[in-house]
Amino acid sequence: MTIIEAIIIAIVEGLTEFLPVSSTGHMIIAESFLGVHGDFVKLFTVAIQLGAILAVVVLYWKKFFQFDKWEFYAKLLVGVIPALLLGYLFNEQIEAMLESPLTVAISLLLGGIVLLFIDKWFPQPGKGKPDLFATETTRSELIEADEKLTYKKSFLIGCWQILAMIPGVSRSAASIIGGMQQRLTRNFAAEFSFFLAVPTMFAASAYTLFLKKWENGGQPCLGYELITASTENTQAFIVGNLVAFVVAILAIKFFINYLKKYGFKVFGIYRIVAGIILLILLLTDTVQ
């Protein structure tokens, strides 16, 4: 993998990780177009999530470092348990699906149809209440919102997040839909989806770096050993995370501002168009 290829894939990761369009699906498509394959590429696409989740921590640092608010961390833990448990039990099946662009295309289409109607299915509760994403959000407003998010709701949203194990579904879309189904406001559901991404993606990255076995020249190794096996790999890892971090910050700011005004419809249309294009490319053997 060249630095340019690493930058392209990192841009795709940063742009799509927190939008309801599936970052995994888009990276599979990007890899197919770039013609990059192999264990390091698979490791790289997961490891650069570290840069993306750091963007959430930086943007919401006041939230993450309120150590007196222990319930915030407890609710995140409850929300992440379903994905961690199922991810561990069905790791091989999930990895097999990651090799299928057809699965991505179908998931993009079906998810797009859902997003077209999501605002009608789950109308916004509490109209006229303070916007949690307003620039001058007060501490009391955030506390009020946190109190509405019970442990039960956190767990059920985490169950929705399991759907994102299917490539093309989108972790962001699944968890936001789960939040809205639990009667959270659209903006608060998106905010909690960002928070939930941090432990979920950190666990996935840690597993790929320190526990999962990869191959380097036919020899088994751990992820961090594969990254440090060559200067090129190390440079790609560092540059990829930096690019993913910067792009993710911009994408999150765009998304929360857009979501406040317009909702999910445009993302549904995009997913449907992207799914149709990918199906055509698969039928014509342009992408395999």
Q: Each PLM stretch: what is its role?
A:
Residues 1-288:
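Multi-pass membrane proteins that catalyze or facilitate reactions on polyprenyl-/lipid-phosphate substrates
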